[in-house]
Every structure is written in C-alpha cells, then in structure tokens.
Amino acid sequence: MPRYKLIIEYDGTPYCGWQIQENGPSIQGALEDAAKAICGEAIRVRGAGRTDAGVHALAQVAHCDVPKQLPPGRLRDALNAHLRPQPIGVITAEIVPDDFEARFSAIKRHYVYRISNRRANLALAINRAWRVPRRLDSDAMHEAAQRLIGKHDFTTFRDTECQAKSPDKTLDQLDVIRDGDEIRIVTSARSFLHSQVRSMVGSLVWVGEGRWSADDLAAALAARSRSACGPVAPPDGLYLVKVDYE
C-alpha cells in the first residue's frame, strides 16, 4: 500500500482546527472524506502540525496510505476536485517511503504571525491578520523576543489544557519584522506547545505597546506560570508556513 506525502494550503477560519473534532468541521476530516470518495474506503490522513481553530497553513504536510497506487498528480487533482468549494488546496502529492511520518519525521516547523498595525479596519485581511491599532515598537518587540530563544520551560506560554508531557522546548527563531503597517513575527522550532506561538505573540504586543519591558517578558518566562502570560493573540494571524525533514 503506497504512502503519499501531501502539502496542503488552507484557510482555517471555518474549521475547528486540523484534528477531527465532534463539535465542528476539521481540515483532517475534510481531507479524509475526499480520500474516502476517491478510494471507496476510510483513509487516515495524518498531519505534521495540529493547528488550532482559525489557524491557517501555507504548507501543512500530511501523509496517507492509499490502497492502490495512483500517479501523484492524479491523486492531487482528485483530492482537490472532491474538496471544492472548501478553502483547502492540495498543492503537491508524492510517493514516499513507508516509514515517513508527517508528524514524527519532522525536524522543524516554521510559523508566521501577521499583525496589521494600523488604525483602519481590515478589508482584504479579515480573518487573516490581527489588527492592533496602537502603534507598536517593533524594535523593542524584536529585542525582547530574543530572551525566549533557546531551551526553556515554556509553562507560561502554553495552554492549561496542553497535553505535552514536558513544557521544555527549544526555540530556534523568534524575529519581529516590520514592513510598513504590517508586522510579521517569524518563529521556528522542532515542535511547539499548544498555544505557545499565540501566547508569545500576545506578550510581545504588550512589549510593543510599552506595557512590558524585555525584562518583564523574561520574568514571565522564568515564572513558569500560565498566570504570568500576557494576552493570547487571536488565531486569525497565525500561519504554518513550512515543515522541514531530513
């Protein structure tokens, strides 16, 4: 039974997240329904990142085992045909070794968070960026962000319902980049805790507003307490942009 690697783009707005849930539609569920329509039997689709409700992806990676070998391009096109008109697109499909695992074979995940730092309402970026009307000091945000780089106990920045066995994670990158009225927060790690990126972003916005200093952010990290976290940024601005493999 051949295994396929899929690269998937989606608008997470209408979904309860990647993972199948009882309380609403999911990206995983939509893909599995499409695969079942093609193959005539239940197909499990496993993703590299279990994105939350409202979070988007430019290049989510998933794998699935298909009972018969199909040309990768044909599988891609068939999945896209069955997914329409949902905001999910299968960008590529390729046959990979049987031991490839989209989640467990990944060595790094890359996310971008978009902040629209302007007074005007959003028009084209509704549900795709977080509008923060107060002018943010992006340089101060970037400087403070470097305090979070490295291996730390990120209890402060993880959801209270996070099921990870350990709060320890190694953060490889956390850059704050301004381009006109848009601020992009770019972050990379092997893996992240539940709500870690959005928790870090919300706290960095407090730094940008002048409510916190870099020392305050470092103190919040050191507190290892969820109550020490700043606000959690909304899911609208978060994108899974790349997953790395050996």
Swiss-Prot record:
Signal peptide: none annotated. The keyword tRNA processing applies. Keywords: Isomerase, tRNA processing. GO terms for molecular function: RNA binding; tRNA pseudouridine(38-40) synthase activity. It holds the Pfam family PseudoU_synth_1. GO terms for biological process: tRNA pseudouridine synthesis. Substrate binds at residue 111. It is an enzyme of class 5 (isomerase). The keyword Signal does not apply. Gene3D superfamilies: Pseudouridine synthase I, catalytic domain, C-terminal subdomain, Pseudouridine synthase I, catalytic domain, N-terminal subdomain. CDD domains: PseudoU_synth_EcTruA. The active site is at residue 52. Its EC number is 5.4.99.12. NCBIfam families: hisT_truA (TIGR00071). Homodimer. Belongs to the tRNA pseudouridine synthase TruA family. This is tRNA pseudouridine synthase A. It comes from Rhodopseudomonas palustris (strain BisA53).
